[in-house]
C-alpha cells in the first residue's frame, strides 16, 4: 500500500513539464499546466536562488505543484511544493530535512534496483525512465520501452508514478495507456513549432492531474 514517509501527492500528477527557466514556468502555468519542475543544472545555489524564488512564487499564485530539481536547500528555505532528486543525489541529500520541512519528494529510477532504492526512501512519487531515447541529457542506461514501463507501473500499482524520457506528442497516448499516472516532457513542448498547441494537446492526453 502507498504509504510515503514524505507528504503525499495526487495519484495522477498529469502532464509534468520539466523546464530550465522561470519564463517557461510562467508560460506553462498560464497555459493550464499544474505540475512542473524547474531543472537548472550545474550552477551554484547563489546563482539560481532568484530563479527558484520566482518559480516558487509563480507556483503559489497558480496553486500548482512546482518541484525544484536538486537544489533542496533552496527548496526548503523558500518552501517549495516539492523536490525532485536523481539517484546520484540521494546519498548527498539530507532527506530528513526535506521531510521535516513538509516538502514532497520525487525520485528518479532507471531499473528495478533503483526502484528498490527509491522505495526505501518512501518518497511522494517515483519517476520511471528513460522510456525512449532522449537528447535532453546523457543517459548511462538503455531506454526501457513501453513493455518495461508497464511492468514497473504494475509493480508500483499503489504508488504515484511519472514516466520520463523521449516522450513525444505522438508517443504520449501509448505511455499513458500503461497506467502510469503522469508523463514528464521536455522537448515535446520546449522544441515544438507551436508550444501552446503542443501543451494543449498533451494536456488532453495526460490531464492536469488529480486535485
Swiss-Prot record:
Organism domain of life: Bacteria
Cofactor stoichiometry and binding remark: Binds 1 Mg(2+) ion per subunit.
CDD domains given in the database record: TMP_TenI
One Pfam family from the record: TMP-TENI
UniProt xrefs under Gene3D superfamilies: Aldolase class I (3.20.20.70)
Residues that bind 4-amino-2-methyl-5-(diphosphooxymethyl)pyrimidine: 37-41, 69, 108, 137
Annotated residues for binding of Mg(2+): 70, 89
The protein's annotated pathway: Cofactor biosynthesis; thiamine diphosphate biosynthesis; thiamine phosphate from 4-amino-2-methyl-5-diphosphomethylpyrimidine and 4-methyl-5-(2-phosphoethyl)-thiazole: step 1/1
GO cellular component entries: cytoplasm
Cofactor(s) annotated in UniProt: Mg(2+)
A biological process term (GO) from this entry: thiamine diphosphate biosynthetic process
Keywords per UniProt: Magnesium, Metal-binding, Thiamine biosynthesis, Transferase
Binding of 2-[(2R,5Z)-2-carboxy-4-methylthiazol-5(2H)-ylidene]ethyl phosphate, residues: 134-136, 166, 186-187
Catalytic activity annotation: 2-[(2R,5Z)-2-carboxy-4-methylthiazol-5(2H)-ylidene]ethyl phosphate + 4-amino-2-methyl-5-(diphosphooxymethyl)pyrimidine + 2 H(+) = thiamine phosphate + CO2 + diphosphate; 2-(2-carboxy-4-methylthiazol-5-yl)ethyl phosphate + 4-amino-2-methyl-5-(diphosphooxymethyl)pyrimidine + 2 H(+) = thiamine phosphate + CO2 + diphosphate; 4-methyl-5-(2-phosphooxyethyl)-thiazole + 4-amino-2-methyl-5-(diphosphooxymethyl)pyrimidine + H(+) = thiamine phosphate + diphosphate
Enzyme class: transferase
Function per UniProt: Condenses 4-methyl-5-(beta-hydroxyethyl)thiazole monophosphate (THZ-P) and 2-methyl-4-amino-5-hydroxymethyl pyrimidine pyrophosphate (HMP-PP) to form thiamine monophosphate (TMP).
Family: Belongs to the thiamine-phosphate synthase family.
Protein name according to UniProt: Thiamine-phosphate synthase
Source organism per UniProt: Escherichia coli O1:K1 / APEC
